[in-house]
Amino acid sequence: MGMTRNHIRQLLSGSVMAACVFSICAMADAPARAQGAAAPARTLAPIPEGDVNALIKKYGLIESKQTAKEMVPDWTKPKMMLVAVDRPDRLAWLQKAVPDVKLVAVRQRGTPAQNVAEALPYAADADAFVGAQPPRLCIEDLIKAAKNLKWIQEPGAGIDDCRDASPEIAAGKFLFTDGTKLKGNVAENLLGMMVTLMRAEDLQVKMDLAPHIQRPDFGQRGWQIAGRTLLVVGLGGIGTDLARDAHALGMHVIATRASSHEGPDFVDYVGLSNELPDLIGKADVVAVAAPYTPETKGMFDAAMFARMKKGAIFISTSREQLVVEPDLAAAVKSGQVGAAGFEINIGPMHEPEGLWGLPNVLITTHQGAPLVEAEGAVSQNENLWVMMRENMRRYTAGEKMLSVAEIAKRGY
């Protein structure tokens, strides 16, 4: 069921057989211990069981056509999985789904190099890497050490950093699943950015920095939202969520995707990726949620910006490599692009070339996960854990998997 406009307006206004690694069983406060003080007691709410069938239906999680037995050469029932966990009782919660599999927990402590060094002794025996928390398990040294590795479960939607961590991953040697459909908070970031730029609220904020109150020069912005056309480039999980929200605000939505012309009812037209040059001129707002692949690198250049409707808004939550930054800067300065907003989401952070400080540009740091959950709401993180636990059960049983990435074929 789609969200109503009132829902959107309200949105805008406003957790046995296991081995413990990195001392997660204690999880005492490190600074307090260092000072000799007793660790403060921590009370964690019980981990909800979750309803995986409801999750599949709500987010449209895609089940693989083949089973794990069919997709993984020489598949055997796993004996051990290496799991990056978020809390000390997470392992027991996961163990209920795979009672005959040894689970080894890892948790972030120290530098990335120290984390890898502590995990290395366990990697050699791991049949699977399951990660939803730091430390990242998708590290080249760990992959090389994991001689029995057959399956990797990553939590994120942007899996290019994992894909590029190892030639074996890029070649599709391992079964790879991710959390691409469970990233509604990223879509909320895009929605907020879009509304901010359409209503020129960014100019109002900058007014607060001036010595006196003065009405901003809105130029050609301060738009009415209803009736405008949004083009979503990359109709995956994030793009679909944004399209739903924009439709609820009264916008017309068109989109592109690499796989097919199929899309939800709230999208008027879904074109293939090669239709982007023809569709981009129809949009008042262009929102990019496409993956970073060799095919998408630099796709938004001077020629593509020239095809946009003059004064249209450009926003992106994708990797910076999709955008030729000097070309975007030139388009903003000339007025061809009326305003632009995007995230700095790969490290180390940098000032985008030619864009930093421009009055019609909104730049944010990457904040894909919510900082504060709504009281009583099931968090995105818990939904991700429910999906990953189900995949652990399915892989162990050799069944069809959820959210399989076709890295060798499509790059994501």
Segment roles from a protein language model:
Residues 14-26:
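Bacterial N-terminal signal peptides
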Residues 36-72, 176-189, 203, 207, ...:
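C-terminal helix-to-coil terminal segments
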Residues 38-176:
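An N-terminal-biased, well-structured beta-alpha scaffold segment characteristic
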